[in-house]
Amino acid sequence: MKPDCSPRRDSCCSLAVESGCPQAGLVSRPHRHPAGVKRLLIWLLGCLLLPLLIVLATLERAPLVSRSESISPASIAEAKCLLANNDPRRLQRGDQRTASIPAPLIDEAINHLVSRSLHGRGTFALAEETAEIRISVPVPGLAGYRYWNLRAQLQEAEGEPRIVAASLANLPVPSRLAEFCLNSAIGLAGFSDEWRAARQLIRKLAFEPARGVVEVSYVWEPGVLAHARARAFPPEDIASMAAAQKALAAQLDHYSARARVPLGQVLSGLLAAAASGEATLRQRRAALLVLASYLAEKNLAVLIPEARLWPRPRRLKLILLGRYDSAQHFAVSAALAAWAGEPAANAIGLYKEVEDSRGGSGFSFADLAADRAGTRFGELVAEGSSRLD
């Protein structure tokens, strides 16, 4: 008589196994599966929670970097001198140059970029053969621990600088992981091509703390300038600027050659021509840039080669409160604030007034007031304020 192999009776389990019954496995497997599934779920939950716990553990109550977002007029002067000595328009492919970049200029540039992109603060400081970057980024919506504080130490080297030490709060970060995260962040921001091209230019980096500069030896490649121009002025912005210049030329054609035209009339006409919807901000920023270049008597073709084919507005005197120079200050500061932010606009405006005071034309509170008013107007444009409608 064959043994009963039915899985319905627990009393037959041992007999089924001993007799080699093919259904024996069906009896014991249900008792093993729940434990395996439980271990798998715990493992998956741990994998999901571990990064979150690490992130929460690195939040701190106080920022490592606490400073304002402002840019000093001295940094504007240093940047102007640096560009004059390394003007890319005068460089040929393969030219070898060494640029001495002041450490304070790098410091304020890093702080400005972190402020604009992450709403945080940053610093840069030199030491012997190394430099340190510190960044504090606020984390909204968390009570108590509210900042990510990052330190990264760079070492001078042939080619691009290398991260030799890094930490997030008190948690050490391996240098390779820090470099990977840096490259990934740059890629996510959409600057992979520009970053790769810039890295290919650099031949040597040297820190000179005694002189307070970073020596950057590079070999020029014109493609970098083309990448930078394309990044700064995408096709949509160029199309908006072309439309704004056409509208400006059409407006000014209605005035006589010696007319003194209130800036408000021209500006309101340009802004009114901006379309409603998502394109409004782009078109208004384009209008400010076109108007600023017109009043500064600069040719946009220097930045945008396509502008050579655009209509040329006739030269007239646009005035603000009866003054041509006030109209210039207002329009230029408004464009700077809309494109680069309020700190840069304020710094450039103050720098120009300081230079005027040294050059003989004198420091003008009226011009400075026009600068600040233009900066505020540019901020309203950048914010898409309904007050402009």
For each predicted feature, which ranges?
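Second-shell loop/turn segments in exported
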Residues: D95-Q96, S167, K317-R323, A335, ...
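Alpha-helical transmembrane segments that form the membrane-embedded catalytic/substrate-binding core
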Residues: H329-S333, D356-D389
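Extracellular/lumenal and peripheral-membrane lipid-interaction modules
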Residues: K38-R258, R372
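Glycine-rich short-loop/terminal segments
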Residues: D237-Q328, A334
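Small-polar-interrupted transmembrane alpha-helices in polytopic inner-membrane proteins
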Residues: G341-S357
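Cysteine-centered motifs
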Residues: C5, C12-C13, C21
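Intrinsic-disorder-associated, low-complexity terminal segments enriched in Asp/Asn/His/Tyr and depleted
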Residues: D4, D10, H31-H33
